[in-house]
Amino acid sequence: LYEFLAGSKNLGKSSISNHIKNDQFVLKDNYKTYLSFFDGSMDDDSLGRELISLAKELNIEIFEFNEIKNFDTEGNIDKHYFDKIILAVGPWSKMLLEQNNIKSQKDIDFIKGSHLIINRKSEFGLMFSGICKSRYIFALPYKDFTLLGTTEEKVSHPELPEISKNEIKYLIDSFNQIL
């Protein structure tokens, strides 16, 4: 489906196969089939700058580097009125809505992604279950390296998410189990 929707912007073909066509990765015998896939890799900072530039070209007034604490659903921020408020603060949305007594239609869990860049080049992406068998891990090409990660660990607060030594060990051990 991704390939169909992407059309000419397709990054690569996903496939299910019985072997890997790359000397860098050799699956252990008990892994008979694998899913190879391609995922986008983006520069979030560059994308953000591009969107800000485009918005300014459209005469949209943007207020950057301003801490907003008090707002309502009518467009009021402190003592100013705005036609629209875009709350683009990721995991902090839940806390800001609660602080301003605004009921959300969605419940937000705080999760963190754990990612490692390992010194091993890959030309395709893999997704596999980790050693605990309840989480999936991905290994994606990233420049001349491999990006190894997962995004399924709940945390109690979004501030300063850090990868733990246990999570590093989990990712590496899980990756090593299939090679």
Predicted regions and their residues:
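A structural signal for short hydrophobic beta-strand segments in well-ordered beta-sheet cores
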Residues: I68-F71, I137-A139
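Flavin (FAD/FMN) cofactor-binding and adjacent substrate-gating region
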Residues: L1-F63, N70, K143
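Active-site substrate-recognition segment that forms the wall
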Residues: L87-L179
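Core beta-strand elements of the Rossmann-like FAD/NAD(P) dinucleotide-binding domain
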Residues: I77-K84, A88
